[in-house]
Amino acid sequence: ACATAGATFLLRTTAGPILQTIQHPLVAISALSALAFFLPSLFAGVPAPVLAVAAIRGRAQSEQALGAMYAAGAVGAIAGTLLAGFLFVPWFGSVATLLTIAATYSVAAFICSWLGRASKTEFLSTSLGLAAVLLLSAGAANMQPVCDRESSYYCIRTVTLSESQTPPIRLMVLDHLAHGISGRDTPRVMFTDHTAMLDALPRMRMRRDEFTSFHIGGGSYSVPRAWADRGISGITVAEIDPEVTSKAEEDFWFEPDMATVVHRDARVALWESEARYDVIIGDAFTDIAVPEHLVTLEFFGLVSERLAPGGVFAMNLIDNTGSLDALAAVAATLREIFPSVEVWTEARPPEPNERRVFVLLAGAEDSPVSAIETKAPGEKRFQALDTGYVDEIIEKTDALVLTDDHAPLSHLMGFNPVID
């Protein structure tokens, strides 16, 4: 109970410094998890073997007692996982969940002390330990939370980037990732490379201001807001987390009448939709967390079915320039469905082992131009990689075609830099 209550302190005091100090997100998340949860997990596992030995000692049919212990452990693990994922974390947050577990341990400690007829000294030591739990819990509950809002999916934060005297510019942070930046007075200006390309490239392909679009992922809603400001209508956004949309409305100047928002998994929403769209945009991908069901051969086939004639599919992707395994796999998979697949990125040589932002354009035909200039937020040039170079990457990496049965894209994107 003390270790679990103490984990709340560790989470709130060390999460910020660890995530800011350790650059690679996988290493940072692993370090934070080990620091906060190693001791609670260790102590939670101690009673089970002790109780198992006590349960079978002196019994003629010890296998029944041992089986009951294992069954109780399995039921508890399943129930705990379900309650944490679908009840406690979504409704109360991670800190309140840990405090609830600490309280449960405390009640169990009192019951065990009573059933075991603890001596006064033992009961006093138990009471002192539980007093420590109470103090730790009260202190943790009063500490400044790391998240502005903790949903079922993300720790959501808003960071103001502009000075107080200038029009506000804000950054949305989902977990550790800077997901989107928006300016109140400049809705058409994109502040990141991936939103700049997702904004400009489909408009370049459409060659008109009136077209329909389906957006996979909302985030700060930078692109839907920019297109609505340009008078583009027929915008549909599939954002799985309602709290993200609420935060976009609250802090990022997104208005509900700018787009039709569907709070569902994007693949399900697209499958259920009977509409055909001129543009489909995939913006649900981060640097280490990838919804694998949105990068498979089967999903890209669904995208192709939902595209109107002459339509285009654009999706962002982050990969390490030292390997480009993930980029090659997605490009190879898209080529199985679409006649034309282009890979766009900033028009500059890559840095060694740089985690580079790419946007893949897929459709029935190639783009009319091989380079564009747009604001991100200053003028920046983006260009399509030569087709021969993309062929070489796919051949060199022996690119895997991703399917619903096997799509290890998170491994290709996130683990290679750590292992290497």
Predicted regions and their residues:
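Short secondary-structure transition/capping motifs
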Residues: 40, 187-191, 216
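Short alpha-helical "patches" and their helix-cap loops
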Residues: 210-218, 372-377
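Alpha-helical transmembrane segments of multi-pass membrane proteins
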Residues: 1-152, 160-168, 176-181, 203-211, ...
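Hydrophobic alpha-helical membrane-association signature
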Residues: 194, 295, 299, 330, ...
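SAM/dcSAM-binding transferase cores
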Residues: 358-420
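Class I SAM-dependent methyltransferase Rossmann-like catalytic core
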Residues: 181-201
